[in-house]
Amino acid sequence: VETQLVIASKRDTRRYRRGEIRDDVFERILQAGRITGSGKNRQRRRFVVLRERRLQASELVTRPSNVRDTPVTVAIVTAEGSSYSGFDAGRAAQNMMLAAWDEGVASCPNAIVDRDAINELVGAGDGEDVAILVSFGRPESDKDPARKSPREWYAGADRMPLHRLVEYR
């Protein structure tokens, strides 16, 4: 799928159908996160794949069903206190979510409500912190990104218009 189409049509998904994500597809999603750049190329992040423990993790986010009802959730663990850690985690999460959508896999980033508990659950070590949880699964209903052009997706998005968002100086 064309890059602009993937970006324009990607929406956070909170309803998933049952079923696993094929291993080869999931590996490509993880590779998209791995290949993401990082501040000063420090690469101070790791990914913890939650399959069995995702039910426990679901109680530690703002919307439990986002994690509970998916086959897999990825915790992005970063170096605590690094000035780049949140930035790097966001970049990796977005790459994984876009790669997933390109494969027909939906995703949703999840805000953490109990940081200490999630750190313990995923085995974050001293000096590490879970920055974000991203859930992945097949969307409840089939969504064909190509049913609209990128221009149509952009025009129909419930987002602030570009002319109000951007200023030139």
Model-predicted segments: where are they?
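Acidic, surface-exposed loops and disordered segments
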Residues: 1-169
